UniProtKB/Swiss-Prot annotation:
Pathway terms, separated by semicolons: Amino-acid biosynthesis; L-serine biosynthesis; L-serine from 3-phospho-D-glycerate: step 2/3; Cofactor biosynthesis; pyridoxine 5'-phosphate biosynthesis; pyridoxine 5'-phosphate from D-erythrose 4-phosphate: step 3/5
Residue numbers bearing the N6-(pyridoxal phosphate)lysine modification: K198
Domain of life assignment: Bacteria
Keywords: Amino-acid biosynthesis, Aminotransferase, Cytoplasm, Pyridoxal phosphate, Pyridoxine biosynthesis, Serine biosynthesis, Transferase
UniProt family annotation: Belongs to the class-V pyridoxal-phosphate-dependent aminotransferase family. SerC subfamily.
Annotated cofactor note: Binds 1 pyridoxal phosphate per subunit.
Protein name, as recorded: Phosphoserine aminotransferase
Function according to Swiss-Prot or TrEMBL: Catalyzes the reversible conversion of 3-phosphohydroxypyruvate to phosphoserine and of 3-hydroxy-2-oxo-4-phosphonooxybutanoate to phosphohydroxythreonine.
Subunit structure and binding partners: Homodimer.
Length: 362
């Protein structure tokens, strides 16, 4: 079978080694004669899977001991509600930074539970889309928390600054599309959450990292399945968790450790992004409209000089084994999502195709 590279924004490409191991173990996991999907989440066999996955995740991100790690249902959108329902306490105002589509979606959900103060961070620099520097965000004194999205998959915008607002500001962040792709200081955050379907594993699982002192503040209206305290007290097994997704996430964590951990992935991701943006920037045929300081290393949107060629580009790229390059309907054009599982060879294959397509149609 010819090599295929999947540039989908999510559900996204998984490491080939992980898929092969899961395939080998699918029908007879660890000699039990059953699949890992079929065993009890409360049995000792799966408890070991769950504990190892959490330990490896903690190791990869150097998560301090005073933070809980929760394996949840509901996706990122579930946490759009989970954050205010758990963190507001007796306050009604929270700061929300709007830098793109997903940040705006979080604001929309938050309005059901509080009065979000929206900080519009979208700016233009030299004709390119950018984000107001974090140091210039105007926060509300006494706000319950500050929420932002470090990586916007649709807009191709990243906020890589490290929060430094003081101990009195609780920072909540949606790391769904950038978790484990670069090193972060977890101590700077009160809550970090991430849907699994980009850099962790398959869809259906969401990870939450929450500082222990923020537990016990949930609204009485908070559903138990979103209550961080309930989930923590039950080791993320208040109800039956997405066990197969949890198992696959554990395999991905072990794969990441074998690659050298997050620091090694950070370097590889930088190489991949530089290669792809380099071809775009040095071409009169392709363009990206995000300022360099805010370009995403995970999601690279680009336009062709002539949109009439979009359909042909997608047809030819698919035939060449380069799949899921169509841009989001909101922005159009193309988008290459190059998460951790995308090898450098995959990006090289894409850039080689782009240069060849330009030679033939430019």
């Amino acid at each position: 079978m010819a090599q295929v590279y999947n540039f989908s924004s999510g559900p996204a490409m998984l490491p080939a080694e992980v898929l092969k191991l899961a395939q080998q173990e699918l029908c007879d996991w660890h000699g039990l004669g059953t699949s890992v999907m079929e065993i009890s989440h409360r049995g000792k066999e799966f408890i070991q899977v769950a504990e190892e996955a959490e330990q490896d995740f903690r190791s990869l991100l150097n998560i301090p001991s005073n933070y809980k790690v929760l394996f949840c249902h509901g996706g990122g959108r579930g946490q759009f509600a989970g954050i205010p329902l758990n963190i507001l306490g007796d306050k009604n105002v929270a700061d929300y930074v709007d830098a793109g589509y997903w940040a705006a979606s979080a604001v929309k959900e938050a309005k059901k539970y509080c009065a979000p103060n929206v900080i519009d961070a979208k700016i233009t620099v030299d004709g390119k889309r950018a984000v107001t520097p974090m140091s210039e965000w105007q926060l509300t004194p006494g706000a319950a928390y500050l929420h932002y999205c470090p990586n916007e998959t649709i807009d191709g915008i990243a906020i890589d600054d490290t929060p430094n607002f003081g101990d009195d500001v609780i920072v909540a962040a949606d790391f769904s599309s950038t978790i484990l792709s670069r090193e972060i200081d977890v101590n700077r955050f009160g809550v970090i959450y991430a849907g699994a379907q980009k850099n962790i594993g398959p869809a259906g699982l969401t990870l939450v990292i929450v500082r222990e002192d923020l537990l016990g503040k949930a609204s009485v209206a908070c559903p138990s399945i979103l209550d961080y305290t309930v989930l923590s007290e039950n080791d993320s097994m208040f109800n039956t968790p997405p066990t197969f997704a949890w198992y696959l996430a554990g395999l991905v964590f072990k794969w990441l450790k074998q690659q050298g951990g997050v620091a090694a992935m950070d370097k590889i991701n930088q190489q991949k992004a530089e290669l792809l943006y380099g071809v775009i920037d040095n071409s009169g045929f392709y363009r990206n409209d995000v300022a360099q300081a805010n370009r995403s290393r995970m999601n690279v949107p680009f336009q062709l000089a002539d949109s009439a060629l979009d359909k042909l580009f997608l047809e030819e790229s698919f035939a060449a084994g380069l799949h899921a390059l169509k841009g989001h309907r909101v922005v159009g054009g193309m988008r290459a999502s190059i998460y951790n599982a995308m090898p450098l060879d995959g990006v090289k294959a894409l850039t080689d195709f782009m240069l060849d397509f330009e030679r033939r149609h430019g």
